[in-house]
Amino acid sequence: MNHSRSHALFAQAQTVLPGGVNSPVRAFKSVGGEPFFVARADGSYLFDVDGNRYIDYVGSWGPMIAGHNHPAVREAVERAIRDGLSFGAPCAAEVTMAETITGLVPSCEMVRMVNSGTEATLSAVRLARGATGRNRIIKFEGCYHGHGDSFLVKAGSGMLTLGVPTSPGVPAGLSELTATLSFNDFEGATALFDEIGPEVAAVIIEPVVGNANCIPPQAGYLQHLRTLCTRHGALLIFDEVMTGFRVALGGAQAHYGVTPDLSTFGKIIGGGMPVGAYGGRRDLMEQIAPAGPIYQAGTLSGNPVAMAAGLAMLELVQEPGFHMRLSEATSTLCEGLKDAARAAGIAVTTNQVGGMFGLFFTDDIVESYAQATACDITSFNRFFHAMLQRGVYLAPSAYEAGFMSSAHDATVIEATLAAARDAFADVAR
């Protein structure tokens, strides 16, 4: 493939953007090489500035569950912009969005719109601290909840990709308020609550870890956390920025049947636009200003164009059978990848929950951050580049989940598997 224009753009970008990108994982530092620059996207495909086409399993890191540039979403945006781009005042679309979310996610009796998943998690933790009068939070190794200071402790996503467990610039006094647990560690959770339970405002967790690749919870683990939080008076926060409306229409909490006190959302609810939200029990949400004393605000929150895009996307995912078909397509892909690896004599396993999946270069089951980081990263990096050269774009890090869309039909998946058979053969050489 020719990447001359992408190469030139990356060189230019590095003179004006730190590392040449606006989010670290995009720079390909984990896998090596240079990123391609996207010119446009449609359906299951990305097209770069050099005219190359890629089957895309990143999906803008999750929002593109119905494929890129879906006509219904695009047309909704086009209609909305005729009336203005931003009002800084209430509009009907944000009410409809809140009603849609509360209708699909019963644990959310009220919702506050924000502009990103990071804003949502920061705001949810502030609410938890204000509501409980406590300061400490518990998170999990490898889980990523945005770039808020409290969360950059043993974090996943770009932090894990770059091998940085904490970030310079985070005050020690603040990071000391964040306790960490191993994901799927029942005994560790019980012991930590026995030690610091009266100080804990909230437990925040990705119910399916998507930022240390894709790691589902063991049976009963989320309910175990629910029980501990209730017993000790702490709030349980599900970060459903990735899983919300993807692993099931009602998110991971519907899929696993566990009810959190607060939930955070993003990605799909923006349809590709910058949107986040947090919601939960009415008695908690009514403590947010102006209804209550806990302050949170945003100039662009509830932006009418973003609301239009998100509402159109949420309408698409409510079509009968949408999530069943998405899960079946993801299963077909995962089974095909394992078969292709096995034929090449390469140790590979996969994890999948609905339309999320993870590919691990190991024979072992992966159920924790430690197991994810023990996989063969060198082989993953070789596989990534072999697939990219064959026109298939996977997440440029061994520590990021993959995402299926409804635009990935049987033909696209078979083309992916054909590329994988050749790519695994390359890795085996």
From Swiss-Prot:
<dbReference type="InterPro" id="IPR004639">
    <property type="entry name" value="4pyrrol_synth_GluAld_NH2Trfase"/>
</dbReference>
<dbReference type="InterPro" id="IPR015421">
    <property type="entry name" value="PyrdxlP-dep_Trfase_major"/>
</dbReference>
<feature type="modified residue" description="N6-(pyridoxal phosphate)lysine">
    <location>
        <position position="267"/>
    </location>
</feature>
<keyword id="KW-0663">Pyridoxal phosphate</keyword>
<dbReference type="Pfam" id="PF00202">
    <property type="entry name" value="Aminotran_3"/>
</dbReference>
<keyword id="KW-0627">Porphyrin biosynthesis</keyword>
<comment type="subunit">
    <text>Homodimer.</text>
</comment>
<dbReference type="GO" id="GO:0042286">
    <property type="term" value="F:glutamate-1-semialdehyde 2,1-aminomutase activity"/>
</dbReference>
<dbReference type="InterPro" id="IPR015424">
    <property type="entry name" value="PyrdxlP-dep_Trfase"/>
</dbReference>
<comment type="similarity">
    <text>Belongs to the class-III pyridoxal-phosphate-dependent aminotransferase family. HemL subfamily.</text>
</comment>
<dbReference type="InterPro" id="IPR049704">
    <property type="entry name" value="Aminotrans_3_PPA_site"/>
</dbReference>
<dbReference type="GO" id="GO:0005737">
    <property type="term" value="C:cytoplasm"/>
</dbReference>
<dbReference type="InterPro" id="IPR005814">
    <property type="entry name" value="Aminotrans_3"/>
</dbReference>
<comment type="pathway">
    <text>Porphyrin-containing compound metabolism; protoporphyrin-IX biosynthesis; 5-aminolevulinate from L-glutamyl-tRNA(Glu): step 2/2.</text>
</comment>
<keyword id="KW-0963">Cytoplasm</keyword>
<protein>
    <recommendedName>
        <fullName>Glutamate-1-semialdehyde 2,1-aminomutase</fullName>
        <ecNumber>5.4.3.8</ecNumber>
    </recommendedName>
</protein>
<dbReference type="GO" id="GO:0006782">
    <property type="term" value="P:protoporphyrinogen IX biosynthetic process"/>
</dbReference>
<dbReference type="GO" id="GO:0030170">
    <property type="term" value="F:pyridoxal phosphate binding"/>
</dbReference>
<dbReference type="GO" id="GO:0008483">
    <property type="term" value="F:transaminase activity"/>
</dbReference>
<dbReference type="InterPro" id="IPR015422">
    <property type="entry name" value="PyrdxlP-dep_Trfase_small"/>
</dbReference>
<keyword id="KW-0413">Isomerase</keyword>
